[in-house]
From Swiss-Prot:
Protein name: Small ribosomal subunit protein uS15
Superkingdom classification of source: Bacteria
Family: Belongs to the universal ribosomal protein uS15 family.
Species, as recorded: Bradyrhizobium diazoefficiens (strain JCM 10833 / BCRC 13528 / IAM 13628 / NBRC 14792 / USDA 110)
Lineage summary: Bacteria, Pseudomonadati, Pseudomonadota, Alphaproteobacteria, Hyphomicrobiales
Gene Ontology biological process: translation
C-alpha cells in the first residue's frame, strides 16, 4: 500500500536534513517505516493477503539495508533514527 502524497511530503519535511532532501537514509527509512506501519495495520484485517505480505517483507529488507548502511557510516545518526521511529534492532 502506498501512502498519500500529503503524508509523504509531511514525512519528508520532518525527516529532511536540509531543504529539498529526499534521498538521505533518514528520509528513506522514514518513508519505508510509514509504509510498513500502514501494511501492518492492513494485515490485522486481511490475514490471508499473502501477496501483500511478500511486499511487506521486501520493504522491511530494504529498510534493514539502509539502516545497515547508516550504521557503517554514522552510528550516532543510526541510533537517533532507531529511537525516533521506534525500530527494534
Amino acid at each position: 500500500m502506498s501512502i498519500a502524497a500529503e503524508r509523504k511530503a509531511e514525512v519528508i519535511k520532518t525527516n529532511a536534513t536540509k531543504a529539498g532532501d529526499t534521498g538521505s537514509p533518514e528520509v528513506q527509512v522514514a518513508i519505508l517505516s510509514e509504509r510498513i506501519n500502514n501494511l501492518t495495520s492492513h494485515f490485522k484485517t486481511h490475514v490471508k493477503d499473502n501477496h501483500s505480505r511478500r511486499g511487506l517483507l521486501k520493504l522491511v529488507s530494504t529498510r534493514r539495508s539502509l539502516l545497515d548502511y547508516l550504521k557503517k557510516r554514522d552510528e550516532a545518526r543510526y541510533k537517533a533514527l532507531l529511537e525516533k521511529h521506534n525500530i527494534r534492532r
